[in-house]
UniProtKB/Swiss-Prot annotation:
GO cellular component: cytosol
Segments forming a coiled coil: none
Reactions that this protein is recorded to catalyse: L-aspartate + H(+) = beta-alanine + CO2
Cofactor(s) for this UniProt protein: pyruvate
Protein name as annotated: Aspartate 1-decarboxylase
Organism: Nostoc sp. (strain PCC 7120 / SAG 25.82 / UTEX 2576)
Length: 127
């Protein structure tokens, strides 16, 4: 049996743009992708704290150190500049893989600069 658990999260980002004319996706500062382990074109779930919207799209890299978090395409209608969002990916794990499971959470400031990277390597030790 496989279980679906959080793999990575970028917490409390600030939307810096919304481009309805782009093909789709969410642009994320390359530094945040690197620190979280989220890959370009990986499926992500985005939660908008301002309006409660939850949606799925895919990540594309924005220039490193740019602070860019930008909704593209149809997703651009689901948030406005200044909204705070959470970006998450999930993975499927077997019972054996769960023994080494470690989700990564990147906490950012209001300019989308990483403040802290948390790895919860003992999360399932009590399960």
């Amino acid at each position: 049996m496989q279980r679906t658990l959080l793999l990575a999260k970028i917490h409390n980002c600030t939307l810096t743009g919304a481009n309805i004319n782009y093909v789709g996706s969410i642009s994320i500062d390359q530094i945040l992708l690197d620190k979280s382990g989220i890959l370009p074109y990986e499926q992500v779930q985005v939660v908008n704290n301002a309006n409660g919207q939850r949606f799925i799209t895919y990540a594309i890299p924005a220039p490193a150190h740019s602070g860019i978090i930008e909704l593209n395409g149809a997703a651009a209608r689901l948030g406005i500049i200044g909204d705070r969002v959470i970006i998450m990916t999930y993975g499927q794990f077997t019972s054996e893989e769960l023994k080494s499971y470690t989700p990564t959470v990147v906490i950012v400031d209001e300019k989308n600069r990483p403040l802290e990277v948390r790895r919860y390597d003992d999360l399932l030790s009590q399960v």
